[in-house]
Amino acid sequence: MAKDDVIEVEGTVLETLPNAMFKVELENGHVVLAHVSGKIRMNFIRILPGDKVTVELSPYDLNRGRITYRFK
């Protein structure tokens, strides 16, 4: 998938799930299932409920995403 095809939105982590998955509520109110991107995992960045994050969504499946950034 090309980088141009992704939709980037901001959201808040609602809960932590097993296998590094998270429930994230987007700014528009939708709740999506998101996993952590490789760069965040490599740098041991902790993501906790309540954190504000940037999520990349595929135009093909808007219910799943990838967390690419955690705001400080």
UniProtKB/Swiss-Prot annotation:
* Keywords tagged on the record: Cytoplasm, Initiation factor, Phosphoprotein, Protein biosynthesis, RNA-binding, rRNA-binding
Alphabetized CDD domains for the sequence: S1_IF1
Domain (S1-like) ranges: 1-72
The family database entries (InterPro entries) matched by this protein are listed as: NA-bd_OB-fold, RNA-binding_domain_S1_IF1, S1_domain, TIF_IF1
Q: Does the keyword rRNA-binding apply?
A: yes
Name any one Pfam family assigned in the record.
Answer: eIF-1a
One of the entry's Gene Ontology molecular-function terms is: translation initiation factor activity
The record's subcellular locations are: Cytoplasm
Question: What do the Gene Ontology cellular component annotations say?
Answer: cytosol
Query: Which family is annotated?
Result: Belongs to the IF-1 family.
How is the quaternary structure described?
Component of the 30S ribosomal translation pre-initiation complex which assembles on the 30S ribosome in the order IF-2 and IF-3, IF-1 and N-formylmethionyl-tRNA(fMet); mRNA recruitment can occur at any time during PIC assembly.
- Tell me, in a sentence or two, what this protein's role is: One of the essential components for the initiation of protein synthesis. Stabilizes the binding of IF-2 and IF-3 on the 30S subunit to which N-formylmethionyl-tRNA(fMet) subsequently binds. Helps modulate mRNA selection, yielding the 30S pre-initiation complex (PIC). Upon addition of the 50S ribosomal subunit IF-1, IF-2 and IF-3 are released leaving the mature 70S translation initiation complex.
PANTHER family per the UniProt record, alphabetical? TRANSLATION INITIATION FACTOR IF-1, CHLOROPLASTIC (PTHR33370:SF1)
What the entry lists under NCBIfam families is as follows: infA (TIGR00008)
| Protein name, entry field | Translation initiation factor IF-1
Native organism is: Bacillus cereus (strain ATCC 14579 / DSM 31 / CCUG 7414 / JCM 2152 / NBRC 15305 / NCIMB 9373 / NCTC 2599 / NRRL B-3711)
